[in-house]
């Protein structure tokens, strides 16, 4: 009888810890996330029409991200979560794509931070609920760890990895999304 009780207690502890520590991340990564040295998740939210276009912009800005398409705007799930990597990505993207405003949402040590970036500068910060009311539902779910990128893929969301594009492919995507790229003069990129 004692073994059954011990076994059930151990199972209960393991089940409770599964919510706290994701074994796929490893102990060091999980500890860095809890201490705030590494973000648990960071998203760049845009008003761009497609995941492919956002992935092209990320590739040209040297940002490693998985970009998800949505009606309200494409979202980049950043891969560099160390230190100020997410903030640097938002600065780089809005510097390379002049005039584009993005929203950076970061979950660091279970604290959600949301700020707008324009022209390479951090602007207004605001409460996460404000972001969640104007973005696809999966943004909140990703930020809180309720859903994973793989789950979104299986649900049919368009996901494009910026690392899967080279410079020429990114430039061709830009050409395809511009007025001139739809068959007008100068639509080819050599």
Regions found by a protein language model. Name each.
Residues 25-149:
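Hydrophobic alpha-helical segments that drive targeting, anchoring, or assembly
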Residues 119-124, 129-190:
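Long, compositionally biased intrinsically disordered terminal regions
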Residues 1-29:
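Acidic, serine/threonine-rich intrinsically disordered low-complexity regions
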Residues 14, 18, 59, 95-98, ...:
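Generic surface-pattern signal
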């Amino acid at each position: 009888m004692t073994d059954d009780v011990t076994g059930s207690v151990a199972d209960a502890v393991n089940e409770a810890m599964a919510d706290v520590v994701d074994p796929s991340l490893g102990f060091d990564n999980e500890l860095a996330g809890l201490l705030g040295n590494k973000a648990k998740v960071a998203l760049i939210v845009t008003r761009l029409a497609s995941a492919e276009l956002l992935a092209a912009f990320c590739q040209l800005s040297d940002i490693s991200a998985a970009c998800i398409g949505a009606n309200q705007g494409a979202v980049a799930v950043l891969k560099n979560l160390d230190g100020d990597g997410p903030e640097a990505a938002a600065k780089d993207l809005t510097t390379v794509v002049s005039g584009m405003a993005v929203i950076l949402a970061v979950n660091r040590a279970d604290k959600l931070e949301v700020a707008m970036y324009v022209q390479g500068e951090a602007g207004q910060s605001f409460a996460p609920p404000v972001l969640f009311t104007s973005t696809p539902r999966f943004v909140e779910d990703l930020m809180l760890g309720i859903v994973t990128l793989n789950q979104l893929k299986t649900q049919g969301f368009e996901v494009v990895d910026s690392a899967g594009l080279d410079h020429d492919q990114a430039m061709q995507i830009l050409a395809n999304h511009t007025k001139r790229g739809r068959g007008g003069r100068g639509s080819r990129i050599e």
